[in-house]
Design a protein with these regions (language model features):
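Negatively charged, low-complexity tracts enriched in Asp/Glu with abundant Ser/Thr
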Residues: 1-33, 59, 91
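Broad hydrophobic/π-residue packing in well-ordered secondary structure
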Residues: 3, 25, 46-50, 67
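Mixed-charge, Lys/Arg-enriched low-complexity segments
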Residues: 4-7, 53-91
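Functionally constrained cores in energy, signaling, and assembly domains
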Residues: 14, 39-42, 76, 81
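Hydrophobic beta-strand residues in large extracellular and virion-surface proteins
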Residues: 17, 25-27, 36-38, 50-52, ...
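Short aromatic-glycine-(Arg/Gly/Cys) micro-motifs in beta-strand/loop hairpins
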Residues: 32-62
Length: 91
């Protein structure tokens, strides 16, 4: 479960918030336009945060990875954006 403090720490200058509750967070990167769905399993072992990703709204999500914390998941997303922008020349 994501805590209120974790959810409030999401950078709204960087992300557009779409859905936010204790178990599910859907955000869009303002840098790349990519969509991210983060799901808290509620279990503390085996990567309790599952990260799903898609490039466009109409595309289906695919699993991008797992994280131990919401903060770690957000860091992974920002690193993905850096890769998209610098290596793939996105935007």
């Amino acid at each position: 479960m994501f805590s209120t403090e974790e959810l409030q720490a999401i950078d709204t200058e960087y992300f557009r918030m779409i859905v936010m509750d204790p178990y599910d967070l859907t955000i869009q990167s303002k840098c790349t336009g990519h969509y991210w769905y983060l799901h808290s399993t509620g279990y503390s072992s085996d990567g309790p945060c599952i990260i799903f990703h898609k490039h466009r709204y109409q595309h289906p999500y695919h699993q991008h990875g797992r994280a131990r914390t919401l903060r770690q998941a957000v860091k992974s997303i920002k690193n993905h954006d850096v890769y998209q922008i610098t290596v793939r020349g996105h935007k």
